[in-house]
């Protein structure tokens, strides 16, 4: 191997808070060569992201500490001992990073154009028409439709997948030598995953760019990475050429990862269950206002005349690419967005109800959002976060009774009840998502809207979460609206499926029939991309 671009030697990271010391990373050593892709894989909490953040010295120092033996060399320059000025020149220029949760990484007060142009100005001095042209070029490269129209958009006006594409465009703006990608395709639908991975490979070939890929998706690792390093409990337990590690894993933990995948069949009933939620001709249109007087000149038809039926104790899967209207449909059905069309829940019309009349029903209809870090208050412990709903709905007469309910909810999603007093920033992305699910489950709802609930979870925890959701459904007759781009998880959970594109349903029906014999070309393209990701030279997806 030639001289490495990045050399990590004896990297150790410890966090010291409230008199406690937590060793997150223990004596990790890695090399990445120019143009190489190294995948760092492991379950949530294994230390993957902490390792990546250490490279650019983005940890919360001095709460985080390295040992004196730690060395991180980028082209011979020691980043651990670099000055702030040296680090500023490297960050976003020679080394760029794509973070796991785009909503917390993008500035909510700045437009798309301003945020991407900022890095061009800082590192290349580019401004004005040249910067705008480069921003548009980058947006097109990452597959954002109608790039020119997105320049003035704010992060909250974009879907989760679109926000992640903005992050990737920002990272690629200065053609870095090393791109650190922390779950870069987690929020993306399967077809865009293939295009983004193809884009990253093309950029590597053009610029000799190296890629440190942090992911829990072993399908992506197998198809993209040159080498792989497997991490658990802060230590690397196996490294090697990807094909060899997948063919003959040596460590028991590696074998455990490779055997983990969502399995099983959705809950099925001998008799057709009663309808719990139904909507007819359901619409969510967003007005387009232009001019000084902000007159409405048109509408974005995010959801356009959809019929939805959810039965008691069953799962309705809603699938489609980012921007198809999946999340908007879920928020609209919950009366969190202005909508048109009748919504009937348990025989009651919801659409005419005001805020006060809806409140008692909020306990029965809960939601788990896509981005857990945005939906969890950083100022509250996870115990307080889960307790909020109990207080609002007056469940549990005493703090002791509420604490018992909270601990049961945390245990049910695979979290140690002893972590009840810790804060969201002390958890990994996957662990935060489990907190969000516990917050919803503690109220024992009848209907749960799950918006990409497993997208931030590693494969083995995905499988555990699917088993958990299926078990809860069987025991409590829970109904789910399961919104996801991960068709493997939908297949394991959903009894019925809606396939959405551009705000309308292109195919719907029994999930087994749709997965085995998809009728619509769009559905067939989604299936092909989900179960075997390959990208043509044009960026189109094929099997």
Residue ranges and their predicted role:
Residues 66-78, 341-350:
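Conserved ABC transporter NBD signature motif
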Residues 153-158, 162, 423-427, 431:
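Conserved ABC ATPase signature
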């Amino acid at each position: 191997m030639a001289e490495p671009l990045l050399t990590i030697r004896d990297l150790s990271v410890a966090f010291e808070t409230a008199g406690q010391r937590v060793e997150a990373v223990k004596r990790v050593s890695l090399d990445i060569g120019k143009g190489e892709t190294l995948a760092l894989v492991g379950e949530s909490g294994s230390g993957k992201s902490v390792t990546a953040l250490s490279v650019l010295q983005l940890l919360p120092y001095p709460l985080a500490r390295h040992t004196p033996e730690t060395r991180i060399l980028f082209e011979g320059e020691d980043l651990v001992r670099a000055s702030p000025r040296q680090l500023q020149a490297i960050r976003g220029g020679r080394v760029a990073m794509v973070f796991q949760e785009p909503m917390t990484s993008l500035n909510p007060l700045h437009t798309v154009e301003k945020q991407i142009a900022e890095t061009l100005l800082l590192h290349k001095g580019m401004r004005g028409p040249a910067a705008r042209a480069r921003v548009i070029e980058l947006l097109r490269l990452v597959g954002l439709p109608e790039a020119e129209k997105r320049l003035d958009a704010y992060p909250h006006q974009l879907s989760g997948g679109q926000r992640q594409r903005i992050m990737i465009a920002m990272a690629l703006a200065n053609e870095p030598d090393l791109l650190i990608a922390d779950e870069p395709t987690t929020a993306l639908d399967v077809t865009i995953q293939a295009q983004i991975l193809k884009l990253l490979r093309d950029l590597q070939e053009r610029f000799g760019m190296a890629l440190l890929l942090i992911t829990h998706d072993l399908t992506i690792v197998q198809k993209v990475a040159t080498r792989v390093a497997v991490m658990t409990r802060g230590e690397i337990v196996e490294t090697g050429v990807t094909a060899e590690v997948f063919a003959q894993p040596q460590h028991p933990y590696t074998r455990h990862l490779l055997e983990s995948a969502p399995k099983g069949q959705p809950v099925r009933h001998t008799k057709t269950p009663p309808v719990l939620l139904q909507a007819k001709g359901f619409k969510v249109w967003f007005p387009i206002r232009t001019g000084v007087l902000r007159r409405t000149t048109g509408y974005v038809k995010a959801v356009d005349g959809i019929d939805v039926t959810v039965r008691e104790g069953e799962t309705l899967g809603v699938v489609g690419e980012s921007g198809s209207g999946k999340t908007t449909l879920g928020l609209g059905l919950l009366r969190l967005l202005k909508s048109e069309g009748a919504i009937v829940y348990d025989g009651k019309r919801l659409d005419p109800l005001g805020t006060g009349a809806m409140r008692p029903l909020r306990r029965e209809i809960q939601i788990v959002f896509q981005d857990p870090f945005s939906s969890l208050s950083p100022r509250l412990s996870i115990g307080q976060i889960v307790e909020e709903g109990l207080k609002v709905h007056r469940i549990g007469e005493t703090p002791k009774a509420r604490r018992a309910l909270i601990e049961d909810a945390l245990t049910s999603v695979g979290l140690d009840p002893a972590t009840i007093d810790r804060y969201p920033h002390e958890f990994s992305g996957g662990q935060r998502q489990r907190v969000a699910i516990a917050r919803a489950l503690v109220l024992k709802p009848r209907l749960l809207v799950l918006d990409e609930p497993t997208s931030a979870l590693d494969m083995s925890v995905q499988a555990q979460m699917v088993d958990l959701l299926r078990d809860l459904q069987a025991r409590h007759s829970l109904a789910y609206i399961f919104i996801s781009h991960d068709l493997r998880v939908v297949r394991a959970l959903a009894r019925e499926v809606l396939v959405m594109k551009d705000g309308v349903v292109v195919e719907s029906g029994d999930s087994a029939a749709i997965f085995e014999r998809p009728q619509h070309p769009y559905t067939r393209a989604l299936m092909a991309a989900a179960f075997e990701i390959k990208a043509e030279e044009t960026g189109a997806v094929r099997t």
